[in-house]
Amino acid sequence: MIESLYSEFEPDITITAKKRKTFDEREINWREIKKCKGVSSFSKGLEEVVVLRHEKKWVNATLIGVESNFLKSIKIKSHLLAGNELFKEKNGAAYGIIGVDLMQKLNAKKGFQSEHEQILIYAPKRNIKIRFGKTPFYSGQIAIAGIMNYNTEINQEKILWPLENARNLLNYSSELSHIYIDVLPKISNDEMKTKIMDVVGDNFVVKTNYEKNELIFKTSKSERLIVIFIMIFIFILASFNLVA
């Protein structure tokens, strides 16, 4: 159960810059990534720590700006508690999908289709000198379309928003912080990791979903082993009682 909740939100492969927070998407040979045998899909991502505000409630969160195909990758429809996966409309209107606990911290409620709850968002400006009378934050509004439920970390900290809108808020143009890759079922993540590393080079870090959540997966396996040992012990005790 624990593994499925983490693995469904975490793409099979994640690429980040080795020594930088962000990188220009033009540094990536997208054609070669597409040509890698076993790549099911990929999505560009931009993650940033932000502050969300609703009325008098202020909460720290992680904004994840992604392309719409990322929602399919994380099986968003199976994890929506309320609302829908509406992300970007043809008229340009954009919507966010927020973790259930984060929504509760803000004391906000999912509105009707015609009146989406509005959340204020603040992100620190980069490389500026703080001066009196000038705000050190970029700011904007996110209309909430859906509430998602995965695991404690996602539920308490994450909010999804279209990549283009996240870039506009953060004053980026072609920067990314992550690339998320889904791998076809018959291809191992470790095998795909090796292929991707050859494409992106030494300036990037490539990790499988297991490597990103290694402690969680190991803990889950340890818990299963403990349960098995307990069951064996109970079975042995029961056998002795029957013999007696």
How does the language model describe each region?
Residues 69, 75, 98-113:
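Short, solvent-exposed hinge/capping segments at secondary-structure junctions
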Residues 21-26, 53-55, 71-76, 92, ...:
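Solvent-exposed, non-transmembrane alpha-helical starts
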Residues 47, 69, 101, 164-165:
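Alpha-helix/helix-capping structural signal
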Residues 65, 97, 160:
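Short aromatic/basic micro-patch
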